[in-house]
Design a protein with these regions (language model features):
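Histidine-/acidic-rich catalytic cores in large beta-rich domains
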Residues: 28-54, 58, 77-78, 89-496
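Positively charged n-region of N-terminal signal peptides that target proteins for export
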Residues: 1-6
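Short beta-strand segments within Ig-like beta-sandwich modules, predominantly Fibronectin type-III
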Residues: 68-74
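Membrane-interface motif at the C-terminal end of an N-terminal transmembrane signal
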Residues: 18-30
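Hydrophobic membrane-insertion alpha-helices, especially the h-region
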Residues: 8-21
């Protein structure tokens, strides 16, 4: 009988060592090495005698295996193994197929360490599991110690609350995926491209005036990055070439808006009149939108000229030169946003804007108390020809002070039309009552216990809650807590 080319594989020897390395005897050699700064990721190095394509399957606990396929035929492959469970003997199956259709399959065990003790217990309420948008929820999570010290814990969880990826390296505010499937992360005044193994691929931007809060990637391959205008504070945007990292131009918002307009909500930093905290691109008309927290304003700006297209926000204290740009509210119900974060242009309809409305005080003259206030997501429809704005959707008001979030927050459109809303900085005193961020009598940040809820809802009016992620410290007598700066829904393995 004619032997096929895989018959000499038997007997096979599989070796498992502490560093999760496995060798299978020739003509196929497979080694799996855990990543250094992404401990739930690994690299499978495969050498075969004949050209093969490769499928890697990571067994899930809930009939939800992860799979990636490399269709190119080669004798050597380096395949990312993503989505391993912590503290688990993970089953990973590798399927090799030759050009003439013969296959070879081998399952191996990859052991991982438990999560660091600082990680929270993540609770999941799955209200409508069939409606959950696919992918992992990437959380820009962080832990507050009793003394206020902060530790970033960026991670990704599945729809059962299991951590399936986390990163231990240096990171600032920014963690955004780009079309290549890699991430852009902030390291000081630098934006670095990083893969899901935690490898730094390239420096994509270096901004001498600083980087903070957010960035967006344009259709023509550039980064728009929140920075500071020269000798100022968090009131600038820079445009950077995505390949060369060259700074192409800057936008000084002291020359675009009115730095003398009174801030609301206020801040402890005297120079912080605007506090840019979110940016998105509107590629259909070569513009971008930014969120200025301390002006409670979202502004659309022409990329070429830096001219204002419109201003979304309350009409109080604007000088005459800006009145022509103020959008007029139409229809009921309608509420202005206050202290907002994370504006997002709808991916199919540039007239629609979704943002997170923190709701700080909601007035210049008659502030709403935290226990009577609310935070949430709100969607507006903007008619630029008429310079009008209509509120078309909202979620969060029904929870009032229970999820009041005076700082940070996020709101995203999902691919299945759902929305992902991040009540990322729910602040309470040790009695459990909601509180504001600052104590202006003492000119200090309030002592507070911080928690986060990330909620997926439908786009209906009223919205139906699909899933809720609850991240809280369990000790009511401690100031230890957790925040989520932003949350995004991405697949671990991105199909390009």
């Amino acid at each position: 009988m004619k032997r096929n080319k895989w018959s000499i594989l038997l007997p096979l020897l599989i070796l498992a060592v502490g560093f999760a390395t496995f060798i299978i005897s020739r003509p196929v050699s497979i080694s799996v090495r855990l990543a250094d700064e992404a401990p739930l990721s690994a690299v499978a190095s495969i050498t075969a005698k004949y050209p093969v394509d490769v499928t890697v399957r990571i067994a899930g606990k809930h009939d939800d295996d992860l799979e990636t396929h490399v269709s190119s035929y080669a004798v050597q492959h380096e395949i990312p193994v993503l989505g391993l469970y912590p503290g688990t003997a993970n089953e990973v199956t590798i399927l090799l197929t030759t050009e003439d259709g013969k296959t070879y399959e081998r399952s191996i065990i990859v052991r991982t360490e438990p999560l660091p003790e600082i990680f929270p217990e993540i609770k999941i309420e799955r209200h409508n599991p069939d409606l959950i948008a696919p992918g992992m929820t990437f959380l820009h999570l962080g832990h507050y110690a009793e003394d206020g010290g902060f530790t970033p814990l960026p991670c990704a969880i599945d729809s059962y609350g299991e951590v399936r990826w986390y990163y231990t390296g240096t990171i600032g505010h920014i963690m955004k995926r780009i079309p290549s499937g890699n991430f852009i992360i902030q390291d000081g005044n630098t934006l670095v491209e990083m893969d899901l193994l935690g490898n730094r691929v390239a420096v994509r931007a270096e901004v001498p005036t600083g980087i903070h809060h957010d960035m967006t990637y344009t259709a023509d391959g550039r980064f728009l990055i929140l920075s500071s205008a020269p000798d100022s504070f968090e009131d600038g945007v820079v445009e950077v070439d995505g390949s060369s990292a060259e700074v192409l131009r800057g936008y000084d918002f002291r020359a675009i808006l009115d730095p003398d307009r009174p801030p609301q909500p206020k801040n402890l930093e005297p120079l912080d009149w605007l506090h840019l905290n979110g940016i998105d691109t509107s590629d259909s008309d070569n513009s971008f939108i930014v969120s200025g927290r301390d002006q409670s304003a979202v502004v659309k700006v022409d990329r070429d000229t830096g001219a204002i297209r419109w201003i979304l926000g309350n009409h109080t204290y604007w000088k005459n030169a800006f009145l022509q740009y103020l959008l007029a509210p139409v229809g009921e119900p309608f509420s202005w946003q206050w202290g907002q974060h994370a504006p997002m242009v709808h991916p199919e309809d540039p007239h629609r804007i979704l943002l997170y409305d923190n709701g700080n005080e909601r007035s210049y003259t008659d502030p709403v108390r935290p226990e009577d206030n609310y935070s949430g997501a709100v969607e507006y429809y903007i008619d630029e020809k008429r310079m009008e704005v209509r509120q078309i959707w909202e979620f969060g008001k029904e929870y009032q002070g229970e999820t009041f979030t005076p700082f940070i927050g996020d709101a995203n459109y999902l691919d299945n039309q759902n929305r992902l809303i991040t009540f990322g900085g729910i602040t309470r005193n040790l009695s459990g009552a909601p509180i504001e961020l600052f104590d202006f009598e003492q000119m200090s940040i309030n002592r507070m216990k911080v928690a986060a809820h990330v909620v997926e809802v439908t786009d209906e009016n009223p919205a139906r809650e699909v899933m809720r992620i609850i991240i809280e410290d369990p000790d009511p007598a401690s100031y230890r807590g957790y925040r989520v700066y932003q949350a995004e829904r991405y697949p671990l393995y991105q199909k390009n």
